[in-house]
Amino acid sequence: MKTIKPQTPEGNEKHTPMMQQYLRIKAEYPTTLVFYRMGDFYELFFDDAEKASRLLGITLTQRGASNGNPIKMAGVPFHAVDQYLSKLVKLGESIAICEQIGDPATSKGPVERKVLRVITPGTLTDSDLLPEKSEQPLLALYSTTQRKTATIGLAWLSMASGVLKLMEFATDAQNADVRLKHELERIAPAEILLPGSVNDLFSEFSLAKNTTVPDWHFDIAHGTKALYEQLNVGTLTGFGAENLSAAIGAAGALLRYAQSTQGKGLQHVRTLTVETENEFIGLDAATRRNLELTETIRGQDANAATLFSLLDHCRTAMGSRLLRHWLHHARRDQSVAMARHAAINALMRADACSGLASTLASVPDVERITTRIALLSARPRDLAGMRGGLQQLPSLRAYVSMCNKDADAPLLKTIHDALATPSDCLDLVERAIAMEPAAMVRDGGVIARGFDAELDELRGLSENAGQFLIDLETRERARTGINNLRVEYNKVHGFYIEVTHGQTDKVPDDYRRRQTLKNAERYITPELKAFEDKALSAQERALAREKYLYEQVLQQMTQHIATLQNIAHALAQLDTLVALAEHALRHNWCAPQLVSEPTITIEQGRHPVVENHIERFIANDCLLSSECKLLLITGPNMGGKSTYMRQVALITLLAYVGSFVPASSAVIGPIDRIFTRIGAADDLAGGRSTFMVEMTESAAILNGATENSLVLMDEVGRGTSTFDGLALAWAIAKHLIDNTKSFTLFATHYFELTQLPEIHPTAANVHLSAVEHKDSIVFLHAVQAGPASQSYGLQVAQLAGVPQPVIRAARKHLALLEANSMQATPQFDLFAGGGSPTTVESAAEPQQASAVDEAIAAINPDALSPREALDALYRLKELSNQ
């Protein structure tokens, strides 16, 4: 960034020199709010002032005129700026921080100013601006199209951790937006960089703040050079990135933008990871939402009942962030999960969780502190926290060594080796940083005593002032005879001798009046003035020396960035594994078995979140294999169908995350994606009805699922007419059985679908059981073989508090509908191979019995008169004869 020196630009002669300087700076940041430092405030002018006033609720004022127009102005105090920056960033704004770098005492004209950093949603590193338990990545996006094939390159960087990743994929240009949206939802960037000539593929995405930069920033040759320089390499072959042209172009734009916002290089970005299409278990946005991994279906995340909040027993913010990442990025490679299973088992076996947890609780966010050290923006308490964290490493290593004494957990061995104490780094912060340093270097008291002789001497001069003032006060009282004479100090007037008005006649001739008060006079003497000059000079020099020393310490700490990053990653892994082990111990979770055969075999499985919120949870089995690929699930509303399906998906996902699972045993085969079609909601903003949302999600499943996918389909077809919905549900289920051959849990209220297993041997019926007693229903929540007999919709409505007159009317109408449905009317047979018409006579018998049962259930004998009872008996007779 260029320093803006006062000079009159062409066309700005009518502005004051200060406003000329401001306008030059603002011209370089036209779409960014410029916080312009003036003394103890950051000021905003013109349109920036109006916008900040509206967003922050601060006062909009005017400051004179410039070029004949009033200057609108708003400002915030510099010492409280973080709270205002945090609010603006959450609103998606970017802010350029323009500081005074010149000396007001020596400047002729406006003080020299410079933009030292630009704060944007994707480039945050300050702890006050970042959420503790989640990342805020910056992502750059670039694509090329040839012969209807789009090649899309992604590069993203977590500025707070220094993790840089690339990904590139080719897809049909017409469907590129679907694949791109899936990846963006997975990465969840806080800010997206786009080429200035943004195309339709990118323009529709509003998942984050979109920032456009010039097209030439995405030049592939520039991107290659930028990566070489950043990673200090001569080839990208070792990273597997040499042929990812689009991703390299995106990386070049990303690094240029990130460096420009920080005003310096990115020392903490030292390596590169290339992600591939088949690396993780695929989870689209609907699945993440329906399984409530890190936020509920209603969009709640903080303290909500999610899988993340359930498992997050992490003692460090690093561990919480890694746990969140694992939940969204379960690897298909079974060896990764199995290594975590072995580590968790070792931690549980050694009974070391409580000791490790209590030690980890005193470890700070080493990952983000390391980043701030690399950017030379770490504050004194960051370094004090780093010192405390490094001091815990020997204890943590001892615990890990004890847990892995059988050497059967290679991951713990890797963590143990990475937690070796960096003695040079620890020695430096132990010697240099005070035990309880001030929050800011400008406040002093940051560098420890004994670290620097010159600083100690200057501090001695300043600190001895107290004794000098006591001695001077004693001597002056004796010399003047004024017993209530006081020698004091304040920041405005410096040192002074205070004498009450009644004693001023005793003041010696060498006293010079400094200030007059209502009841006293304040004086200075040549001796006190000389001491003041010496003491205040020593204090200023001590602060300057301390600032210099602190900067030197930071520079020396940057030599240990790579080591500190490795330690941070090991600490995060250990913290996450301990949290998962703790939860498994408390809730009797088991180690899942990952196998190569196609199967999902779960015994006594439970929903991990639901079981934690109710007193007694009914465990259920699930058996899916090459012989049984689809379970048709029927049963009453509120019977637990959705909970059962979700628990199977969550147990499967947890097994691949590397966690133990809520079951007595679980054997899981290869899984590539998990799909869910659960619940119903309009997409009003997108102009889509409930049924359109349902069909869109169903289409994504049918087009994307494979034989290694797990598919959850709940109540497909209910958003349209009965026969349309039934036909679609049947066709979708049949396609999943015949073509996709995915592991499928298919819940439905269309009892006609329960005939599918008679035609397809790889399908089976199960139902959630319930017991009806009079007009009420008891849900047993147990999964049993075979189809359900009825849906118990009226009983559920009654439980929900629907008025009795409505329930009675519904029962009468239901009886009428069922009576009519028993008449032999031609209907197309969904399950017939041809198109010949057939009747529903075979299906009428159970419906007839159901109609009689419902009519009997609707009768309240205690409320009937003899005549009404006789009429009811005739109605039952009539129903039984139909």
Swiss-Prot record:
UniProt-listed NCBIfam families: mutS1, PRK05399.1
Gene designation: mutS
Protein name, UniProt field: DNA mismatch repair protein MutS
CDD domains the record matches: ABC_MutS1 (cd03284)
Top-level taxon of the source organism: Bacteria
Lineage: Bacteria, Pseudomonadati, Pseudomonadota, Betaproteobacteria, Burkholderiales
Any single Gene Ontology cellular-component annotation: cytosol
A GO BP entry: mismatch repair
Keywords, in A-Z order: ATP-binding, DNA damage, DNA repair, DNA-binding, Nucleotide-binding
Pfam families per record: MutS_I (PF01624), MutS_II (PF05188), MutS_III (PF05192), MutS_IV (PF05190), MutS_V (PF00488)
TM segment ranges: none
Family: Belongs to the DNA mismatch repair MutS family.
Residues reported in the UniProt entry to bind ATP: 635-642
GO molecular function terms attached to this record: ATP binding; ATP-dependent DNA damage sensor activity; damaged DNA binding; mismatched DNA binding
Protein purpose: This protein is involved in the repair of mismatches in DNA. It is possible that it carries out the mismatch recognition step. This protein has a weak ATPase activity.
